[in-house]
């Protein structure tokens, strides 16, 4: 199994994380990883994948934000697993609440990504969806209730049962699949709460990308792993 970083930062489509800003954030993640010894994952926009890989690909885990259920060929605007591999990325997110997929498409693309050797992280909105995601045997399932995303209210505190239950059901169907906690994670105490509930790590976004000092924000998050 490929290693799943305990902290993954999704850049989304924030202007603070596109182009030169994406490279700046990527360097911050690399610095923090080197200083703390904690593996960090980052998910830059597709247009910045190759540049980010060239900049910090040897220092952090670089993932795409999404991949489409499409094969190479006449698929205008689609992103295939092969394209992500060719860009040099290590893996991808799938089925984020802002980029939902039909279950049949998710099954196909998850299998294709794993076959291509990509670290594959499937997002799920609740424990029921987490179980379905775990049944696909991805490297990780990230539990993110959509109503909490971007609110600053962490799921680990707002609804701890969904984290505990998700860990339980994912491990029932795929023991080696890691479980990440997302939605509203902003500081080290949120991370600590998630880990205490059984999560293997966290998936974050605005808490780092939009922070006044992204490096300090990331260091604070990592402190919750101690």
From Swiss-Prot:
Cell compartments where the protein resides: Cytoplasm
Broad class of where this protein is predominantly found: cytoplasm
Binding locations of substrate: 10-12, 149, 184, 205-206
Classification via Pfam families: TIM
EC numbers: 5.3.1.1
Any one Gene Ontology molecular-function term assigned to this protein's record: triose-phosphate isomerase activity
GO cellular component, one term: cytosol
Gene3D superfamilies: Aldolase class I (3.20.20.70)
Broadest EC class assigned to this enzyme: isomerase
Superkingdom, taxonomy of origin: Archaea
Pathway participation: Carbohydrate biosynthesis; gluconeogenesis; Carbohydrate degradation; glycolysis; D-glyceraldehyde 3-phosphate from glycerone phosphate: step 1/1
Protein keywords: Cytoplasm, Gluconeogenesis, Glycolysis, Isomerase
InterPro entries reported for this sequence: Aldolase_TIM, TIM_sf, Triosephosphate_isomerase, Triosephosphate_isomerase_arc, Triosephosphate_isomerase_AS
Catalytic reaction list: D-glyceraldehyde 3-phosphate = dihydroxyacetone phosphate
Catalytic residues (UniProt): 96 (electrophile), 144 (proton acceptor)
Family: Belongs to the triosephosphate isomerase family.
Quaternary assembly: Homotetramer; dimer of dimers.
Role, per record: Involved in the gluconeogenesis. Catalyzes stereospecifically the conversion of dihydroxyacetone phosphate (DHAP) to D-glyceraldehyde-3-phosphate (G3P).
Record's protein name: Triosephosphate isomerase
């Amino acid at each position: 199994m490929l290693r799943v970083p305990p902290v993954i930062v999704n850049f989304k489509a924030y202007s603070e994380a596109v182009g030169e800003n994406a490279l700046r954030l990527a360097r911050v993640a690399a610095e923090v990883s080197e200083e703390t010894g904690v593996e960090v994952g980052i998910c830059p926009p597709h247009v910045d994948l190759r540049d980010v890989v060239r900049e910090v690909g040897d220092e952090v885990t670089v993932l795409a934000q999404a991949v489409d259920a499409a094969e190479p060929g006449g698929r205008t605007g689609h992103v295939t697993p092969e394209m992500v591999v060719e860009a040099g990325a290590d893996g991808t997110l799938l089925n984020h609440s802002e980029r939902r997929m039909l279950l049949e498409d998710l099954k196909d693309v998850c299998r294709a990504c794993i076959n291509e050797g990509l670290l594959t992280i499937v997002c799920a909105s609740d424990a029921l969806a987490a179980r379905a995601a775990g049944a696909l045997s991805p490297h990780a399932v990230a539990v993110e209730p959509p109503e909490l995303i971007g609110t600053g209210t962490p799921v680990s505190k707002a609804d701890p049962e969904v984290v505990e239950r998700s860990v339980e059901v994912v491990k029932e169907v795929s023991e080696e699949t890691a479980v990440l906690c997302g939605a509203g994670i902003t500081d080290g105490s949120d991370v600590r709460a998630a880990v205490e509930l059984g999560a293997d790590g966290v998936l974050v976004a605005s808490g780092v990308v939009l922070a006044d000092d992204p490096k300090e924000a990331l260091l604070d998050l990592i402190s919750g792993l101690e």
